[in-house]
Amino acid sequence: MLSFTGMAYFPYDPSFRVTGHFVPDPKLATATFHTSHGSDKDYYHIGDVSFTLKGHDLTLPFFARSNDPAKIKSGQGFFTDALTGKGAYGAGRYINIDYQNSAHDVVLDFNTAYNPDCARSPYWTCPLTDLYFDVPITVGERDPHSLHHDAS
């Protein structure tokens, strides 16, 4: 029998807390993601956050499950990075922002990056992303399958 031993995180690093600029997508365009179960799942593109991290200019799109702005409270950004499959979960990680339907500055704290539910159970269906940051995101939740939870 397996027992829950807690969740593993990389050490906190304040340099992974950055301010970016959110630009909403007025069309809330449909984005179809392939999932961990081989099906497709529709999300709605709520906008993009542009930011600089470790000297790299990056953009992270954010998505919601609703296309009704009155019902959207937050958005999820899906990403992979240089540690994906090497200490970070192989299908990528997520980060959330509060939703406002206007351009504004927003803080992205990658220390809060988390694994999708499918990292812990094969019964969950999770969207997969091909967005790759060529920057090792050495903060946030680690791969729960990594025996040593080691980023090396």
What are the residue ranges of the model-derived segments?
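Short beta-strand segments
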Residues: 56-60, 93, 106, 133-135
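A structural detector for beta-sheet-dominated domains
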Residues: 19-21, 52-54, 61-63, 80, ...
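Extended, aromatic/histidine-rich regions of cofactor-dependent oxidoreductases associated
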Residues: 105-107, 111-152
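N-terminal domain-onset segments
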Residues: 1-30, 37, 41-43, 47, ...
